[in-house]
Curated annotation (Swiss-Prot):
Name by which UniProt lists this protein: 2-isopropylmalate synthase
Disulphides: none
Pfam families: HMGL-like, IPMS_D2, LeuA_dimer
Further remark: Present with 6630 molecules/cell in log phase SD medium.
InterPro entries per the UniProt record, alphabetical: 2-isopropylmalate_synth_dimer (IPR013709), AIPM/Hcit_synth_CS (IPR002034), Aldolase_TIM (IPR013785), IPM_Synthase (IPR005668), LeuA-like_post-cat (IPR054692), LeuA_allosteric_dom_sf (IPR036230), LeuA_N_DRE-TIM (IPR039371), PYR_CT (IPR000891)
Any one of the GO BP annotations: L-leucine biosynthetic process
Catalytic activity: 3-methyl-2-oxobutanoate + acetyl-CoA + H2O = (2S)-2-isopropylmalate + CoA + H(+)
């Protein structure tokens, strides 16, 4: 067999060596071979002695959800009022204390929903609305928020050179003047208005396209806005510094945040907020580095909804903190229900690979991953019994139970799965901790079955396959069943098993000897079937604890097949409240499995009667 394999390998090698497959030449049908002729790299700020790389995130930021405004405006089919209400209450229940609910000056629907939020928000939740820097729109927005316990007016103005020059044809001085004018009007209509004193008014200004704005101009325009608003330490002004379009790597954004944080005056009266989009796929990284660089507040959406490629995913940012031992002050204990609301209201599915929330993020299909996870759980269970609480499981940075998931879905089994995957499912579904050799054998059967179906196997399918493959507890095939038995001890090592078994309709007496109950029963069945069985492996363990404890026994028997006299092996499993009974069940499960396979024949009626007669004669 080895020689044939070597010859086959040599033939394969010779076959490939004789063929020439030329390299693939890139066509560049649409992309440019040299993109530098069309695109230029971002001109990053020069920041010396940056401090943020040495910082750590040690506390939660202020969070603002803009799902109902930025997220909703980007949907192909925006939310209905009822969906907005459901979403709003889910955000409140998660723990968001700042929620941007609308653009109330844009439509009556947005205005009406703002009024709903004002009337139904808990006292500690601030309702935020976005508005352009125009007088009539600002007045309408203030009207929508009147009566709120806590409210934030959010104005914005594009400050990047490209937007000022191409879109608005506006100088820097004109931009500053417009931002200050809007700020003064908001102040006049809110915190300076005697009739509005029941509301705690806050103000947010966004230099839109901040990440593409020269740093010194971003500071200059915000200084002017701050002077117009006159914030306090108790109620600081919010400067939202958005990566409206992500144009550079996250470290550049962090440099921009640190530059702003170290150059803006009266820092104690300023709340720096991030608002990262995901155009380059780095929204989460930019947000986290922004916090390292001094940001106090984070804006975004659940699961990253938003314009184009979306806003930063607040679930990911929050849970990244959580898995580093820092409480995000947001409760995602039932993340599946959050996912359901987001998908139903947004009418956009969340990727199965989305961090933390995706259906597959706590699942392992790879055999090596499954084996590592199984070993991790086994060790962790032992450590927890000793009082250790730290979570240390390979491939699982988060305990699935913390977000409302169970362990059943952690390991999924397909044709690529190894012994650990199938063994994990059996451990979770039947409580059986399979011996290593049995794991290897069963995983092969599982892989073959998954291959034949061309899909993943469900837990109940794997359990059914196991019960059939190993005649679990002698429940599948019962060609021979035990009626009664007794084991007597002779001397220090010899045991004699006597009993009766039912073969078909006949009751047959059996007898065997060995150095223990297991070997003597195996000898008795060997005598009955005229086949020499031997115990190749035997293990047992307890199931459960306390009064409900059961024992599981695993028997691996060797024998020679009737057809060709070749040596073969079979496993069997028995479970009972009594360890002796569980081992007996395991032996009969194995013997009946061997008979069912056709490797060994059941005695004929004449043979059974002959054995009974012989037993009676010897008696």
């Amino acid at each position: 067999m080895v020689k044939e394999s070597i010859i086959a390998l040599a033939e394969h090698a010779a076959s490939r060596a004789s063929r020439v497959i030329p390299p693939v030449k890139l066509a560049y049908k649409n992309m440019l071979k040299d993109p530098s002729s069309k695109y230029k790299p971002f001109n990053a700020p020069k920041l010396s002695n940056r401090k943020w790389p040495d910082n750590r995130i040690t506390r939660a930021p202020r969070w603002l959800s803009t799902d109902l405004r930025d997220g909703n405006q980007s949907l192909p089919d925006p939310m209905s009022v009822e969906q907005k209400k459901e979403y709003f209450h889910k955000l409140v229940n998660i723990g968001f204390k700042e929620i941007e609910v609308s653009f109330p000056s844009a439509s009556q629907t947005d205005f009406d929903f703002t009024r709903y939020a004002v009337e139904n928000a808990p006292d500690d939740v601030s309702i935020q609305c976005l508005v352009q820097s125009r007088e009539h729109l600002i007045k309408r927005t203030v009207e929508a928020l009147t009566g709120a316990k806590k409210a934030t007016i959010h104005t914005y103005l594009a400050t990047s050179d490209m937007f000022r020059e191409i879109v608005f044809n506006m100088s820097r001085e004109e931009a500053i003047s417009k931002a200050v004018e809007a700020t003064k009007l908001v102040r006049k209509l809110t915190k300076d208005d005697p009739s509005q004193q029941a509301t705690r008014w806050s103000y947010e200004f966004s230099p839109e396209c901040f990440s593409d704005t020269p740093g010194e101009f971003a500071v200059e325009i915000c200084e002017a806005v701050k002077k117009a608003w006159e914030p306090t330490e108790e109620n600081p002004i919010i400067f939202n510094l958005p990566a409206t379009v992500e144009v550079a790597s996250p470290n550049v954004y962090a440099d921009q945040i640190e530059y702003f944080a170290t150059h803006i005056t009266e820092r104690e009266k300023v709340c720096i907020s991030t608002h990262c989009h995901n155009d380059r796929g780095c929204g989460v990284a930019a947000t986290e580095l922004g916090m390292l660089a001094g940001a106090d507040r984070v804006e975004g959406c659940l699961f990253g909804n938003g314009e184009r490629t979306g806003n930063v995913d607040l679930v990911t940012v929050a849970m990244n903190m959580y898995t580093q031992g820092v409480s995000p002050n947001l409760d995602f204990s039932d993340l599946t229900s959050v996912l359901d609301v987001v998908e139903r209201c947004n009418k956009i599915p969340v990727s199965q690979r989305a961090p933390y929330g995706g259906d597959l993020v706590v699942c392992a299909f790879s055999g090596s991953h499954q084996d590592a996870i199984k070993k991790g759980f086994n060790l962790q269970n032992k450590k927890r019994a000793q009082g250790e609480t730290q979570w240390r499981i390979p491939y699982l940075p988060l305990d699935p139970k913390d977000i409302g998931r169970d362990y059943e879905a952690v390991i999924r089994v397909n044709s690529q799965s190894g012994k650990g995957g199938a063994a994990w499912v059996i451990l979770r579904s039947l409580g059986l901790d399979l011996p290593r050799n049995m794991q290897i054998e069963f995983s092969s059967a599982v892989q073959d079955h998954a291959d034949s179906l061309g899909r993943e196997l469900k837990s109940d399918e794997i359990s059914k396959l196991f019960k059939e493959a190993y005649n679990y507890n002698d429940e599948q095939y019962q060609a021979i069943s035990l009626v009664n038995y007794n084991v007597e001890k002779f001397g220090t090592e010899r045991r004699v098993f006597t009993g009766q078994v039912k073969v078909g309709d006949q009751i047959v007496d059996i007898e065997g000897t060995g150095n223990g109950p297991i070997s003597s029963l195996v000898d008795a069945l060997s005598n009955l079937l005229n086949v020499r069985f031997a115990v190749a492996n035997y293990t047992e363990h307890s199931l459960g604890s306390g009064s409900s404890t059961q024992a599981a026994s695993y028997i691996h028997l060797s024998y020679r097949r009737n057809a060709d006299n070749e040596k073969a092996y079979k496993w069997g499993v028995g479970v009972s409240e009594d360890v002796g009974d569980s081992s007996v069940r395991a032996i009969f499960a194995t013997i009946n499995n061997i008979i069912h396979s056709g490797d060994v024949s059941i005695p004929s009626l004449a043979e059974v009667e002959g054995k009974n007669a012989a037993a009676s004669g010897s008696a």
